[in-house]
Amino acid sequence: RTTQKVKVIEIIYVMDANSGTEKELWIKAGAIILEAVKFIERANIRIKLSVCMYFAKSGNEIAISTVKIKDFGDKLDLQKVCFPMAHPSMFRRIGFRWIETHPDIKEYGWSSGYGRSLSEDGKELTEYIKTPVHAYSISAHQIKKMDFDVIKVLNHFNCLKK
């Protein structure tokens, strides 16, 4: 009997944005991520899926909030993952509430706003948090720059055979 190594990928979807962002961006980008996850899992690659609903800076403080949506062994349950992956309220209401009530957020600038989106500044979440080698972060803005093309997203995750 030979044991097979199971391929795994961790995806962290960053859904922060500035106040002028249209809700359609999150809906379309979230749908593309879920389409990519379905494709990857059909290729027998296990996915850990997290959403980062806050990735911003104010003064010298950086706020990062992530929530695990699906673990490697979990089946993809669209009923469970659609809200956190594609609904604007996940970022706007739950993300804002997190920043408003987090006890370690001390910088005065947070009181007059919600900080500056780091993903819009072209920063990668993986620059700020420790992740395994097989982890990828992608933002709604990156997906928009990829023309909401699932093939380009899969290439970003190195999931297509060359």
Predicted regions and their residues:
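Short coil-to-beta-strand
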Residues: T2-I12
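Acidic, glycine-rich A-domain
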Residues: V6-K7, A17-K23, I27, A31-L34, ...
